[in-house]
Design a protein with these regions (language model features):
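Short amphipathic alpha-helix that is part of the acyltransferase structural core
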Residues: 1-19
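A conserved beta-strand-loop-helix scaffold within acyl/acetyltransferase catalytic domains
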Residues: 17-44
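Conserved acetyl-CoA-binding loop-helix of GNAT-fold acetyltransferases
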Residues: 55-68
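Conserved beta-strand-loop-alpha-helix junction that forms the acyl-donor binding cleft
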Residues: 79-91
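Short, high-confidence coil segments that cap the C-terminus of an alpha-helix
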Residues: 72-75
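Conserved catalytic-core motifs of GNAT/GCN5-like acyltransferases
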Residues: 98-118
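Short, aromatic/basic amphipathic alpha-helical patches
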Residues: 88-100
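Conserved acetyl-CoA binding element of GNAT-fold acetyltransferases
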Residues: 41-54
């Protein structure tokens, strides 16, 4: 696991769903081919994930490492927003493999453009 600069994140070629600009105060973590941008503005822990390179490492162990990083840095909730299969895969990974006592906090729907589910997942 490595902490990367926001400039590194901003230099990555990403698709439309993950083309988010990192700003001062955000945190970028790189674990086994996957980059995590933790947006910290207004104390929200919105996380954007991007697969930088194909990895043979198990996705569950990558998320376990990421959760350990969250616990060490006192990030208690992650905000997951989106729609479609990738959104639900990430939600299910965080929920299914979360430590005992953690899990789904709550969910709301809001968006004029499309149905967008916003979930807050407790990390520990």
């Amino acid at each position: 696991m490595k902490t990367k600069s926001i400039e590194w994140w901003n230099s990555l070629k990403k698709n439309d769903d993950t083309d988010v600009t990192a700003i001062e105060g955000d945190t970028v973590v790189y674990i086994s081919g996957i980059a995590f941008l933790i947006q910290r503005k207004n104390d929200f822990n919105n996380v954007v994930c991007w697969k930088v390179k194909t990895t043979k490492k198990d996705l569950v162990s990558i998320f376990s490492t990421f959760r350990a990083f969250c616990q060490k840095n006192d990030i208690q909730y992650l905000r997951i927003e989106g729609h479609g299969k990738h959104h639900y895969k990430m939600l299910n990974l965080l929920y299914k493999y979360s430590p005992e006592g953690a899990g789904l906090a709550y969910a709301v729907e809001e968006s004029k453009e499309y149905k967008s589910n916003i979930w807050y997942v407790k990390t520990y």
